[in-house]
């Protein structure tokens, strides 16, 4: 069920990251090469999850792997235990919690009208449900971490912290973010552009669906503009 996916991506996945932050306090905080294999493993896992997103034809699976890839960046930031790294990890977990939950909500909106999650079968929604296309665009821009969103703040802090700790990590980070932008654009174009496959009369969007998306994106934008709300 989609509600379970929203709770899993928005809350349960982030609880694991919070638990790691608490448990990492027992390890040494000084710079040591002991952490390098784990950082490389976390970033490589993020890249592999992003590449898996590019191969997905199932919309729900694509969003799920997207959440996994972002948590790879969070894990890498938590491991080095610097103030910027931990701040970026917390910011990205909160921001991506809203973003991934919103994407799952939009996937359910599409599924209720097409009864399929296959990307090629959900094309052409910009002609049928233009307001939903706007929500898709905003959610994908947040997923890409466009400035001045909180997603961008989190990723920028993580990138700065990892670069200061080990400059070579910028290669894996840059590759991960490039692939993230690629699959986000692919997801948006596959669900909204092109000729529609629907032959029957499509049910219009309901006020509750717009309210649900508003309750996801408005808090995220407010936190992006005023981070003091969560500090």
From Swiss-Prot:
Tagged with keyword NAD: yes
InterPro entries in the cross-refs: NADH_UbQ_OxRdtase, ND/Mrp_TM
Main EC class the enzyme belongs to: translocase
MF (Gene Ontology): NADH dehydrogenase (ubiquinone) activity; ubiquinone binding
Residue spans crossing the bilayer: 1-21, 34-54, 63-85, 89-111, 128-148, 156-176
One of the GO BP terms on file: electron transport coupled proton transport
This protein's record includes keyword S-adenosyl-L-methionine: no
Membrane topology: Multi-pass membrane protein
Primary localization: mitochondrion
Keywords: Electron transport, Membrane, Mitochondrion, NAD, Respiratory chain, Translocase, Transmembrane, Transmembrane helix, Transport, Ubiquinone
Pfam families, A to Z: Proton_antipo_M
Subcellular location: Mitochondrion membrane
EC number(s) on file: 7.1.1.2
Catalysed reaction, written as an equation: a ubiquinone + NADH + 5 H(+)(in) = a ubiquinol + NAD(+) + 4 H(+)(out)
Cellular component aspect of the GO annotation: mitochondrial membrane
Role noted for this protein: Core subunit of the mitochondrial membrane respiratory chain NADH dehydrogenase (Complex I) that is believed to belong to the minimal assembly required for catalysis. Complex I functions in the transfer of electrons from NADH to the respiratory chain. The immediate electron acceptor for the enzyme is believed to be ubiquinone.
Family: Belongs to the complex I subunit 4 family.
Name listed for the protein in its UniProt record: NADH-ubiquinone oxidoreductase chain 4
Organism: Bothriechis schlegelii
């Amino acid at each position: 069920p989609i509600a379970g996916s929203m709770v899993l991506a928005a809350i349960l996945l982030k609880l694991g990251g919070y638990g790691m932050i608490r448990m990492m306090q027992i390890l040494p905080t000084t710079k040591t090469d002991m952490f390098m294999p784990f950082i490389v493993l976390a970033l490589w896992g993020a890249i592999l999850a992003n590449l898996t997103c590019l191969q997905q034809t199932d919309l729900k699976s694509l969003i799920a792997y997207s959440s996994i890839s972002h948590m790879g960046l969070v894990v890498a930031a938590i491991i080095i235990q610097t103030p910027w790294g931990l701040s970026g990890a917390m910011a990205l977990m909160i921001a991506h919690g809203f973003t991934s939950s919103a994407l799952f909500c939009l996937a359910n909106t599409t599924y209720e009208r097409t009864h399929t999650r296959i990307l090629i079968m959900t094309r052409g929604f910009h002609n049928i449900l233009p307001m939903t296309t706007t929500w898709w665009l905003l959610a994908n821009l947040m997923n890409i971490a466009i400035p001045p969103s909180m997603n961008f703040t989190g990723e920028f802090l993580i990138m700065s912290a990892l670069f200061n700790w080990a400059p070579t990590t910028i290669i894996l980070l840059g590759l991960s973010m490039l692939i993230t932008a690629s699959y986000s654009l692919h997801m948006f174009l596959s669900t909204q552009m092109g000729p529609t496959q629907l032959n029957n009369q499509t049910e219009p969007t309901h006020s509750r669906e717009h309210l649900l998306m508003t309750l996801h994106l408005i808090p995220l934008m407010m936190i992006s503009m005023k981070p003091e709300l969560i500090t």
